[in-house]
Amino acid sequence: MVVFQTLNGNDQPQTVSVEYQNEDWELPPVTSNPPPLPFPEDEQEAKKVTDANDLYDVSLASPVRCDLPLLQGGKVADEELSKHLQNYIGCLTRVWGPALQQAGYKAYQPKITVFPEGETVTTGCGTSKSQNAFYCGADQQLYIAQDILDVLSPDVDQARSVFDLIIAHEYGHAIQGRSGILGGKHVLESDLSKSEALELNRRNETQADCFAGAAMSSLWKGLNLTDQDREDIIKTTFEIGDDQLAERHNLPDTTGDHGTGANRRLWLERGLGAQTLGSCNTYTAPSGEVE
């Protein structure tokens, strides 16, 4: 429990206590060698882990401590960003680790690599260009280049929450990996048409948006997030929708693989208000909610 003082309406000190959760849970060290990911043996098992995962019955603890000041917005030195995000990943692990274990899965703390803008990074999944942030299932690590801000709207690229939101989304993919959802997706998509595979991928991405919202909700008090942060988080998620990116960067009007701005925002907000992770079950949602 943390006790601190605030001011009431009469500008008088008022003691407020916060009973943080998961305080006794032992945070695993950062690792570049996590346990292997679970992988379903057939389509029946794959459907079970995507559509009816044991994780969906679990609630994330809240509030969870995160003694970490947010960045002030915009680009910072790569070393500063790397230190901030690795500490933030520790907070996310304190949120997600007990939930994974409750559902019967193994928790770990992934490593973040911040690579220079304009350059490439070599990962277990191959080589990737900058203006990107991603989770690599082959090495179970997270990667980000600061010039990912260049693809965002000027309305949100200076928000102090932007890097934390992006990493919460990518950490959501790490949770999908550890819970077998990613493995299930890979099994299921092998026999799908192109349009069906795109929809399956959008289900996966919007679930990561929802997981990001749920985790940030758990960390809300610990990070001292505000109503303005909430507005920025919601707007940023909308701005990275397939349709919004296409319009802003004059890209061809094609079917996207991440979801429209409206649907990405929908699932983020569901995560922010989730009582259980079943609220993030995009795999059984109507197609219209994952367009």
What are these regions (language model features)?
Residues 179-202:
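Post-HEXXH active-site segment of zinc metalloproteases
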Residues 96, 161-181, 208-209, 213:
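Active-site recognition of the HExxH zinc-binding catalytic motif
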Residues 117-145:
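Catalytic zinc-binding patch centered on the HExxH motif and its immediate surroundings
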Residues 1-60:
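N-terminal low-structure segments adjacent to metalloprotease catalytic domains
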Residues 148-166, 196-200:
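Short pre-active-site segment immediately N-terminal to the catalytic Zn-binding motif
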